[in-house]
Design a protein with these regions (language model features):
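Extended ligand-binding groove/face enriched in aromatic
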Residues: 76-170, 181-184
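Active-site cradle of extracellular carbohydrate-active enzymes
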Residues: 167-171, 179-230
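Second-shell loop/turn segments in exported
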Residues: 8-9, 49, 117, 175, ...
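Oxyanion-binding "anion nests"
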Residues: 219-257
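CBM-like carbohydrate-recognition segments
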Residues: 2-60, 66-104, 112-113, 131, ...
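Structural motif corresponding to the intra-repeat A-B loop/turn of tetratricopeptide repeats
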Residues: 70, 112, 116-119, 170, ...
Length: 354
């Protein structure tokens, strides 16, 4: 059954918006030389001292989004530039101390490999997977991937969700059983340890060495990662996964949304990226399983950003999309706006089904 599209479903409007926001990264955050992007706008002394490895992995991801939307080779060139920048700034290595950082890079690099047919890039994604699998998985807290090298007993959704997604995608790409085995084993651990019976996903366990779950950290990011993991395993043949993803999506909206939007989970920084991760993987759920109510939430919430969050000629996004940006804005926050708008551009091209 197909319904009439909502006013915010015009694909040309969303394509134009996505293009404007892609270009906003250079407009507001562009930096010379190896810095590539300033961490904040406006940028002040000391703001660029942190090398935000995982933010840049998401920059790579959104450039691929732009390429898939437009087919323009310039977007692939931008993606390659970001990848090369990460490698150079990381002393030529694919690895760092944070397993989640490495997994985000692997996911983006694998998408770049798929977009370009570059087998060498696909091999880099496999190298990261093997490194994380070898050094990240252990028996603390019953299994799972550690968050970082220095805390092998601390396990969380930010490390295990991307590992499931990457493992499932590598299995789809290669057919190798080891990837699907790792995906299902990690998903079983995640569901047993951090997914509540209502579908809401907790952040982590044993951060302080006390075996406690960090229930006070309630992030859209974790919900999005679990949704993405479910969608990937559904594509691998597990028919039960889409219903679980739907349950989590609706639990996240019920618990974390206000006035139809996620209103902010901190003052920029890493938290600025969280809702973008939710939008990316919730959009994949809509494309995989229909979900008309979730589709409407994604489109309407991002429309709110464009109607209320941007003023005059400013395209800087706030963490709360109901209001214009004020003060300093991190490019992580801008990335969430770009991801959501790219998701809407993709969804607007598809019919609304029920």
């Amino acid at each position: 059954m197909t319904a009439e599209p909502r006013p915010w479903g015009d694909e040309h409007v969303w394509d134009s918006r996505a293009e404007l926001l892609q270009n906003s990264l250079e407009r507001y955050f562009g930096a010379p030389g190896e810095q590539l992007l300033n961490n904040w706008h406006p940028c002040e002394p000391g703001d660029n001292e942190t090398f935000n490895f995982w933010w840049l992995a998401h920059v790579l991801d959104v450039r691929i989004d732009a390429y898939l939307r437009t087919g323009e080779e310039s977007r692939i060139e931008q993606a390659r530039l970001v990848y090369e920048n990460i490698r150079r700034r990381n002393h030529g290595s694919l690895f760092n101390d944070y397993f989640d950082d490495m997994l985000w890079l692997a996911l983006a690099v694998l998408r770049l490999a798929d977009a370009t047919g570059d087998a060498a890039l696909a091999a880099q994604a496999v190298r990261i997977w093997e490194h994380v699998h070898t050094h990240g998985w252990n028996d603390h807290e019953g299994g799972g991937i550690a968050w970082r090298v220095q805390q092998p007993a601390y396990k969380n959704t930010p490390a295990n969700g991307p590992f499931v997604i990457l493992s499932a995608r590598l299995h789809e790409r290669t057919g190798e059983p080891r990837f699907l085995t790792a995906a299902t084993r990690t998903m079983e651990w995640l569901e047993k340890t951090l997914v509540r019976t209502d579908g809401f996903v907790e952040d982590g366990v044993n951060r302080l060495g006390d075996h406690a779950i960090d229930s006070q950290w309630r992030f859209t990011y974790n919900q999005g990662l679990y949704i993405g993991a479910c969608v990937e395993l559904a594509q691998a043949g597990d028919d039960t996964q889409l219903a679980k993803a739907s349950r989590t999506a609706h639990a996240a909206i019920a618990e974390l949304a206000t006035d139809g939007v996620f209103t902010g989970e901190g003052g920029g920084g890493d938290e600025g990226l969280f809702k973008g991760v939710f939008y990316r993987y919730a959009g994949q759920l809509v494309r995989a399983g229909g979900e008309p109510e979730l589709r409407e939430f994604l489109l309407a919430g991002t429309s709110r950003l464009w109607e209320s969050g941007f003023q005059d000629d400013s395209l800087l996004a706030a963490d709360d999309w109901r209001r214009p940006a004020q003060g300093k804005i991190a490019y992580s926050t801008q990335l969430s706006a770009i991801m959501a708008t790219e998701v809407c551009a993709a969804l607007s091209k598809e019919p609304i089904s029920s």
